[in-house]
Regions:
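Periplasmic N-terminal accessory/gating domains of Gram-negative outer-membrane beta-barrel systems
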Residues: 83, 91-92, 115-226, 237, ...
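Surface-exposed extracellular loop regions of Gram-negative outer-membrane beta-barrel proteins
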Residues: 190, 195, 201, 337-339, ...
Length: 779
């Protein structure tokens, strides 16, 4: 027995020692929030470390802490005259260094030598001028939150005021607004909706976000009353930041899963100059299944994308970064060749869709003196959609063209902004953006699959311009009262329209635990350019459409119950006007779901109103667990050309989400299991009553538009699950992931269709379960 124990100890003790030897480096840069000036001598301490682990920043604001054990650590950063900041629950793994970029806010006091300690404010946005309806999200949350599927858009559906447009895609409905009102910005530049198969099911949504979460850093999501720097959005803004590649060593990630192959790499281009690269490439495994003839559904889906960022700091000329994203999509479906197999019209249609989308940008950042910071952008975005559909005759002998679409859009953007710290209490930001918009749009289509109606709808090409300017002032009126005021000017060349938009925000800290906030904004948004190009009788009938506009009012209350638990309530009212609609009918773009085949003459005749309350109870990650409970009650109504107030399509009434996650650590933190679950309950979308007898007679769905959106689909209840298991090796990490959306198989309600086999109009529903099993290695 003694011999046996000696053998076991001989084998086990080296493994234990090996585990204890695995450590990692945490590095970063600390700078002034307004001017981006590096803060020299700032103190960085690992909370609750014994003995104390910490360091100070050098002349470039950089710091490095080596030999940190695996697991999670919280950092406290302090600097005289600035508010201290806590960075909570930073994950330390064996494969990759942790590199942080940390901004500190100058304290609202001018007393020399005073150090102000701020609590953990994870719920606040990165943008210091966002007073209400804004929060930050991290790349780790997209991986951890159940239902996120590594996608920022799906992650956001867990936040208060947000619901999924449909489980089939990642579109989101924010406070009753159509998904088309959501804007995406990348590296400070507005970009086209970055989705694979964007707008195929719902405009503003797609299958999955175009860029991998391997390349994004902490980013902001705003849902109302935006600061003045944000324009061209009525619903929400994703302000996404890309990470900067590691400047000291090379690191790589490879992942294979049900949904795709993913490879990322980063590292120094020049260690001496601090330049670096970061890139990521993905290829859809669904495409591989099609190539191998494993996918038997008849729908062949392929997509791939590339993201990159090159960063070049200089000694005196500031920092230059070249970045870009691009994607290629293709989906093809063959019609069923036997008429007896047809259930709906889609079964007798051949469909092919190719999409090319990309953005490339050059950013320059430089400090100007001790109080100013200048950021400039030059970027080009482009999209190219090519769709063809053919309709099989009743006897399955002849295909007739149903639609031919070629849609190309391009945007050349030149932008610059100046942030100037007037004093420790006041910061001014001004900016100017000029965009040249290019378009080429050719569409011919039949109406309701009737070949004899096939005709040209649009054939137009040209360009126009969009010019925007803004000024935003942040002023600390007192230690407890912060004001943000701004003005934005917006000129759209196509309609020759100038819009002046005021913005305001007020945050009042009642005590260390309680605060009130108020926000107001006037906002505007042009339509997709193809809407302006629609022809009726050979005449472009929509070129004089004005900008759609809205007033946003938000009143918020925050209660920090503990340093990790907060309650937040926001009441809001939005009034919309000048939304395009059809004269004399209930039709309006406020309910728009798809826009590729839009062919109506429109006028700015629609008004809308959204109002409700959003509630959040959030327990931030700590002690190895977190939870998030959000609820919203709201109404969304509109009045179009028939002058009747009605429900909008997106007046779901309510949405409720509950998320929970727990981490389990084993083997001296070398192995980590995290389990995450989500349950969501949301009201169904609205739809119009169906004229049954007319629909059956014409073998297509005909809606009663005089009672538009008076009916509602059933309440949707679904659950999501995410399980990750990480193994930290000495120089690499392995991560096994199981993600499943709609794990209980709840049916989703899609639309109504005429069924050839039953001769009836039937509700189209599906049980859509989205699994993603993957293996990732970091090295």
């Amino acid at each position: 027995m003694k011999t046996f124990l000696n053998i076991v100890l001989f084998l086990v003790l080296p493994l234990v020692a090996h585990a204890q030897d695995i450590t990692q480096t945490l590095r970063g840069t600390i700078y002034d929030q307004s001017t981006h000036e590096p803060l020299i001598g700032a103190t960085v301490v690992v909370q609750n470390s014994q003995p104390i682990i910490g360091t100070t920043t050098d002349e470039a604001g950089n710091f490095s802490i080596t030999n940190l054990p695996l697991g999670r650590v919280s950092l406290e950063i302090s600097y005289i005259g600035y508010e201290s900041r806590v960075i909570p629950e930073v994950l330390i793994t064996s494969a990759k260094e942790v590199v942080l970029s940390i901004a500190l806010k100058e304290a609202a006091t001018e007393l020399e030598g005073v150090e102000v300690v701020a609590g953990i404010r994870k719920e606040k946005a990165l943008n210091a001028m966002a007073t209400v309806s804004a929060r930050t999200f991290s790349v780790e949350e997209t991986q951890r939150y159940a239902g996120g599927l590594n996608d920022p858009a799906r992650l956001a559906s867990a936040f208060a005021g947000v619901s999924t447009g449909n489980l089939q895609d990642n579109s989101i409905v924010v406070r009753g607004n159509a998904p088309q009102g959501v804007q995406w910005r990348l590296e400070g530049v507005e970009i086209p909706s970055p989705q694979h198969f964007s707008g195929g099911n719902v405009i503003g949504g797609g299958l999955v976000t175009l860029f991998s979460n391997q390349v994004i850093g902490n980013s902001d999501f705003l849902t109302g009353a935006f600061p003045a720097e944000y324009g061209n959005a009525l619903a929400a803004v994703f302000d996404v930041k890309m990470r900067t590649g590691n400047t000291s060593r090379y690191e790589h990630t490879a992942q294979v899963g049900v949904l795709g192959l993913d490879f990322a790499s980063e590292g120094p281009l020049s260690r001496a100059k601090g330049s670096s690269y970061l890139f990521n490439y993905r290829y859809s495994t669904l495409g591989l299944l099609s190539d191998l003839k494993i996918n038997k559904t008849g729908q062949r889906i392929k997509y791939q994308d590339l993201s990159f960022k090159l960063n070049f700091p200089t000694e005196k000329a500031g920092t230059f970064s070249l970045w870009g994203i691009g994607g290629i999509d293709n989906t093809h479906k063959d019609a069923l060749s036997v008429p007896a197999d047809w259930k709906t019209d889609i079964d007798r249609v051949n469909n092919n869709w190719e999409t090319y989308v990309g953005t490339v940008g050059l950013r320059h950042q430089i400090t100007a003196g001790e109080r100013s910071f200048v950021e400039s952008h030059l970027a080009f975005s482009g999209t190219d959609d090519r769709i063809s559909t053919d309709y099989l005759s009743d006897d399955a002998s002849v295909f007739s063209p149903d639609s031919r679409l070629k849609k190309q859009n391009g945007t050349l953007t030149l932008a610059t902004s100046l942030t100037h710290k007037l004093s420790p209490l006041a910061t001014l930001k001004v900016g100017l953006t000029s965009k040249q918009l290019f378009y080429k749009y050719n569409l011919s289509a039949a109406q309701d699959y009737v070949p004899s109606t096939y005709a040209r709808i649009v054939n137009s090409a040209g360009s126009t311009n969009l010019t925007e300017g803004y000024a935003q002032l942040k002023y600390q009126l007192s230690p407890a009262l912060l004001a943000n005021v701004g003005l934005r000017a917006h000129y759209f060349g196509l309609s020759k329209e100038l819009s002046l938009e005021s913005r305001a925000g007020l945050a009042w800290k009642l005590s260390d635990k309680h605060s009130l906030s108020f926000g107001y904004g006037k906002h505007s948004q042009p339509e997709d350019l193809n809407v302006y190009m629609i022809e009726v009788g050979g005449v472009a009938v929509n070129k004089d459409l004005k900008l759609s506009e809205a007033h946003h009012f938000v009143l918020g209350y925050d209660w920090m119950l503990t340093d990790k638990l907060r309650f937040k309530a926001e009441a809001y009212y939005q009034y919309l006007w000048n939304i395009p609609g059809e004269e004399g009918t209930s039709y309006s773009l406020i309910n728009l779901r798809r826009a590729l085949y839009l062919n109506k003459a429109l006028v700015n005749n629609t008004k809308g109103r959204n109002y409700g309350i959003d509630l959040t109870l959030e327990r931030f990650l700590g002690d190895n667990y977190y939870y998030l409970i959000t609820g919203s009650i709201f109404k969304s109504e509109y009045k179009a050309g028939d002058n009747v107030w009605r429900n909008t399509r997106y007046n779901k009434g309510f949405v409720l989400n509950a998320l929970f996650g727990k981490e389990f650590y084993f083997a001296n933190n070398r192995k980590v299991l995290d389990v995450n679950a989500r349950v969501s309950v949301t009201g169904g979308e609205r739809y119009s009553p169906i004229l049954e007898s007319q629909s059956v007679a014409q073998k297509r769905v005909i809606y009663d538009e005089s009672s538009a959106f008076s009916e509602q689909f059933h309440t949707l209840t679904y659950a999501d699950l995410t399980v990750n298991y990480r193994i930290n090796h000495r120089k690499s990490s392995s991560v096994f992931s199981f993600q499943m959306k709609n794990v209980l198989g709840a049916p989703i309600y899609i639309d109504h269709n005429y069924n050839y086999q039953t001769g009836q109009i039937e509700l189209s529903k599906a049980t859509l379960v989205i699994p993603n099993i993957s293996y990732k290695i970091e090295f």
